[in-house]
From Swiss-Prot:
Protein purpose: Part of the twin-arginine translocation (Tat) system that transports large folded proteins containing a characteristic twin-arginine motif in their signal peptide across membranes. Together with TatC, TatB is part of a receptor directly interacting with Tat signal peptides. TatB may form an oligomeric binding site that transiently accommodates folded Tat precursor proteins before their translocation.
One record GO biological process: protein transport by the Tat complex
Membrane topology: Single-pass membrane protein
Record carries keyword Transcription: no
Source organism of the structure: Erythrobacter litoralis (strain HTCC2594)
Keyword set, alphabetical order: Cell inner membrane, Cell membrane, Membrane, Protein transport, Translocation, Transmembrane, Transmembrane helix, Transport
Region of interest (Disordered), ranges: 74-138
Protein's recorded name: Sec-independent protein translocase protein TatB
Length: 138
């Protein structure tokens, strides 16, 4: 930030000792430290405010783009033409809709029953299966 080299810093320290004196130097350095701290605090607050304004502008811009894109999509696909995926076809009667739902659920039930059959078969081998001499007896 400030381009102060070692020689400039040494000159400033010598002048400060001569002007302020060694007795008042700690008080002067404390005061200078407080000023520098306040300057940093104000600078940080200012930078944070600018970052927040930039972030808000970006969010507003993205919101505007999102609204435009949403309007385009809604114009291409009007709401009256769209149906929910899980809703039955309105042309079907209630009985036909129930039957279609039951047919869709059958493969899942069959898979569950098959897994249960396999588990019970693993636990209790059939009597016709030969036993090896090393297998444990029930």
């Amino acid at each position: 930030m400030f381009d102060i080299g070692a020689t400039e810093l040494l000159v400033i320290a010598i002048v400060a000792i001569l002007v302020i004196g060694p007795k008042d130097m700690p008080l002067a350095l404390r005061t200078a430290g407080r000023w520098i701290g306040k300057i940093r605090q104000v600078s940080s607050h200012f930078r944070t405010g600018l970052d927040a304004m930039i972030r808000e502008a970006e969010i507003e811009e993205m919101d505007k783009k999102w609204r435009e894109r949403n309007a385009e999509i809604m114009a291409k696909h009007p709401a009256d033409q769209m149906q929910p995926l899980d809703a039955p076809d309105p042309a079907l009667s209630a009985a036909e809709a129930r039957a279609a739902h039951t047919e869709a659920a059958k493969p899942a039930r069959a898979a569950e029953e098959t897994q249960a059959d396999r588990a019970s078969a693993d636990e209790h081998p059939a009597a016709s299966e030969p036993r090896l001499p090393l297998e444990g007896r029930d």
